[in-house]
């Protein structure tokens, strides 16, 4: 509800990170990661995943229009995503902005190193 008030105040977009940390290596949600999560707990991957994707679930669950774009790459060549969120019914704005960003900094041919 709080976010919905931003659109009424005249904001066009909300900008958040896609992930709460850089991309994990394969298997990074399993085993002993030294994060206090018991690796024997069958829910350990879900617990870690919830911490990792803290910015996207509320928009997925609510149907709020959002788009995630790979706008930066770290030193390992992994994409760092940015999430843009718009008001209900403003998918057109997200698609236009995404198109402009991709034209300015294409990513289709970028691959992790």
Locations of the language-model features?
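Serine-dependent amide/ester hydrolase catalytic core
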Residues: 1-61, 111
């Amino acid at each position: 509800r709080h976010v919905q008030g931003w659109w009424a105040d005249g904001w066009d977009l909300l900008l958040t990170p896609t992930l709460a940390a850089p991309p994990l290596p394969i298997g990074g949600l399993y085993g002993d990661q030294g994060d206090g999560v018991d690796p024997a707990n069958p829910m350990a991957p879900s617990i870690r995943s919830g911490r990792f994707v803290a910015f996207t679930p509320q928009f997925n669950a609510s149907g709020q229009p959002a788009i995630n774009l790979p706008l930066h790459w770290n030193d390992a060549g992994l994409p760092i995503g940015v999430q843009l969120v718009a008001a209900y019914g403003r998918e057109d704005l997200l698609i236009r902005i995404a198109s402009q960003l991709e034209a300015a900094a294409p990513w289709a041919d970028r691959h992790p190193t």
